[in-house]
Structures are given as structure tokens and as C-alpha cells.
């Protein structure tokens, strides 16, 4: 199993976020997220090797624990092929299929993570004789949202339906955010405007029909006439701008 490379390979975990790219790695995933609709038999994810060397690639899904080994994870999805070789400047399509081995909620989205681990080829023994060598295996993770058919509303409108409230204690400012929709809402950034200043918010993904508390950095206590500005992420990795008064 390529994931268990502890002695000769240093694993650098690279999380693929919106508006960023895994340019430090040679394998590039087409997109920043996967939307798997329940009426689809499968979804294809394209991988491209932008580097100059062939690479071995391992693909799998997890439930959110990025330290879990692929063999220990139980998810209702398969990734085919799980291991592949991608030559330089070539690509590979990974087929994701929902197996229904675990029943998922039908009234809301479910989230999983799609992983890609690229392992460089073994170096020529003669060229590296008597030399110290560090090989890096880069791992990229993006979210997979399983979306049941018939959910109410539109996922692009979910960020604008969020409810924002003051929270916090002992002089520390934070916000409680309620998501009344059946869709996950992810953010790229957010800040709070008060008294002519802006304070960064530690934004978090909010699950359907749930709350999250987000810290407001640099602000002590509540502020009058405050306004929240945020950028949420749509199905295509683009930005949805939103505002809310407190």
C-alpha cells in the first residue's frame, strides 16, 4: 500500500482549497470539489500529470479523518482504478461510484473527501549511491458532496440563507452561524466590519441544518452596527459574495 511509506518517503499533505492549486505537486485534479448527484451511476474525476516524470498515483475516499489509512476506511464509494501510473504530460480518469453499502440521508447532503497520493519513481541506484535522498509523496484532498435528488432550494442560494448571531464569552468575540438548508456551505474567507475596521473571521464549513461558532480575530466583545462580509464557494469552485448585518 503506497500510503504506508514511512522510512524512505516523507509525506507532505497538501489540502486543495478553493482558489488555490496543487502546483507544488505534479498531479493536478480537475476541480476543487466533486458533486455526486444521487441519480448518477458514477462520476469521473480527471487527473493530469503536469510534471516531467511518470508517477504512481493512489486514489481513495475518506470520511474526514485525514490520518486514517485507506485500508481501514469504510465508505459507500469506490475509486477505480485505486492505483495507476500516469506518464509525464498525460492524464488518468478516476471513476467514482456510489455502492450504497451504507445508507446516506435523503433529506440533506453528505460529505466525503477524495484523496490523491502521488509517489515519485524510484531513483536510479547508481546515480544516488552514497548520497542522502529525500523523496516527497504529495497528497491532495478535495471534498465530495453526495447530493440526494429532490432537496429543497438551490445550493447556490444556501450561503445567503445563513443566519448570523453574536456569540462568545469573557470578552472574546465570536459568531454563531445557523444553516437552515439541506446543503453544506463552505467559505474561502470572511470578515466582520465594525467602526470602520475589518476583523478576520475563522470561517468553517457548515453542515446542513446545523450551527457553527466562528471566532472573530482582533475584536473584544460585541460591536454596534456590525456587518459580516464573506465569500462562499459554489459547485464550480467559484465565489458567492454575501453580507449580513448583526
UniProtKB/Swiss-Prot annotation:
Disruption phenotype: Deletion of the operon under classical laboratory conditions does not result in any major effect on E.coli capacity to form biofilms compared with the wild-type strain. It comes from the Bacteria. GO terms for biological process: cell adhesion; cell wall organization; chaperone-mediated protein folding. Induction: Repressed by H-NS. Induced by heat shock. Keywords: Chaperone, Fimbrium biogenesis, Immunoglobulin domain, Periplasm, Signal, Stress response. PROSITE patterns: PILI_CHAPERONE. Residues 1-25 form the signal peptide. GO terms for molecular function: protein folding chaperone. GO terms for cellular component: outer membrane-bounded periplasmic space. It is found in: Periplasm. The keyword Calcium does not apply. Pfam families: PapD_C, PapD_N. Belongs to the periplasmic pilus chaperone family. The operon is cryptic under classical laboratory conditions, but is functional when constitutively expressed. Part of the yadCKLM-htrE-yadVN fimbrial operon. Could contribute to adhesion to various surfaces in specific environmental niches. This is Probable fimbrial chaperone YadV. The gene is yadV.
Amino acid at each position: 500500500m503506497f500510503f504506508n511509506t514511512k522510512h524512505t518517503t516523507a509525506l507532505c499533505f497538501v489540502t486543495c482549497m478553493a482558489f488555490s492549486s496543487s502546483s507544488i505537486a505534479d498531479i493536478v485534479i480537475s476541480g476543487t470539489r466533486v458533486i455526486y448527484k444521487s441519480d448518477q451511476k458514477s462520476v469521473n474525476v480527471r487527473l493530469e500529470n503536469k510534471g516531467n516524470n511518470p508517477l504512481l498515483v493512489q486514489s481513495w475516499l475518506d470520511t474526514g479523518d485525514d490520518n486514517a489509512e485507506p485500508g481501514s476506511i469504510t465508505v459507500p464509494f469506490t475509486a477505480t482504478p485505486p492505483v495507476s501510473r500516469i506518464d509525464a504530460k498525460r492524464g488518468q480518469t478516476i471513476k467514482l461510484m456510489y455502492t450504497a453499502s451504507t445508507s446516506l440521508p435523503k433529506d440533506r447532503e453528505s460529505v466525503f473527501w477524495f484523496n490523491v497520493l502521488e509517489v515519485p519513481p524510484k531513483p536510479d541506484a547508481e546515480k544516488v549511491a552514497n548520497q542522502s535522498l529525500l523523496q516527497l509523496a504529495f497528497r491532495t484532498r478535495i471534498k465530495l458532496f453526495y447530493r440526494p435528488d429532490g432537496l429543497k432550494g438551490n445550493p447556490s442560494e444556501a450561503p445567503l440563507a445563513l443566519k448570523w448571531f453574536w456569540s462568545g464569552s469573557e470578552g472574546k468575540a465570536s459568531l454563531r452561524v445557523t444553516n437552515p438548508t439541506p446543503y453544506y456551505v463552505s467559505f474561502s474567507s470572511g470578515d466582520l466590519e465594525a467602526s470602520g475596521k475589518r476583523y478576520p473571521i475563522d470561517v468553517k464549513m457548515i453542515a446542513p441544518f446545523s450551527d457553527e461558532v466562528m471566532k472573530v480575530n482582533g475584536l473584544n466583545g460585541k460591536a454596534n452596527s456590525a456587518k459580516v462580509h464573506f465569500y462562499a464557494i459554489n459547485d464550480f469552485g467559484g465565489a458567492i459574495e454575501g453580507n449580513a448585518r448583526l
